[in-house]
Amino acid sequence: MGVAQSNTTLVAPQPKGIIDPATGKPVGSNDPFFGEINNELADKGFLVTSTDELINWARTGSLMWMTFGLACCAVEMMQVSMPRYDVERFGFAPRASPRQSDVMIVAGTLTNKMAPALRKVYDQMPEPRYVISMGSCANGGGYYHYSYSVVRGCDRIVPIDIYIPGCPPTAEALLYGVLLLQKKIRRTGTIER
């Protein structure tokens, strides 16, 4: 009727990687990305990456965009900042000054009189700078393509990184364009674009 005693010492297993103090479990234990990082940290004690990957990772999480709303597409551009879509959760926050912006969203019809102002604002943005062309009018003139006063695509004035089609494109389409831009930034090196 006695309890058998063992002479072996019981040792609690050591958790691997970065431990969340609130739960006591490894951070992101269900996420494959964090699982890979935790395994590498537990194995080596440090992470190995290139400077390009680190800089591009930081860029994608802190993109500041400047609005260049010219027509009805600007309403959808404003909607993407509202709580339903909340683009700021992806590290994409609005700024009012071109000197603090990384991304310019051209939304709407670009006229010949507005084209020099667009180029001037683009030139004031620091490098690296990116441009999203939003809507049919910004992409190729749209409904006003044959008008004498409309530029047939803002790519004639500034280089475009992402085109978002639609008249007007939905907020989901703009959000998808932002995610594509982040993917493009992660894919490129820091020296060449």
UniProtKB/Swiss-Prot annotation:
A cellular component term, taken from the record's GO annotations: plasma membrane
Annotated binding of [4Fe-4S] cluster, by residue: C72, C73, C137, C167
Transmembrane segments: none
Top-level enzyme category: translocase
Keywords carried by this UniProt record: 4Fe-4S, Cell inner membrane, Cell membrane, Iron, Iron-sulfur, Membrane, Metal-binding, NAD, Quinone, Translocase, Transport, Ubiquinone
Membrane disposition: Peripheral membrane protein
Cellular compartments annotated: Cell inner membrane
Xref: HAMAP family: NDH1_NuoB
Name of the protein described by the UniProt record: NADH-quinone oxidoreductase subunit B
Organism of origin: Rhizobium rhizogenes (strain K84 / ATCC BAA-868) (Agrobacterium radiobacter)
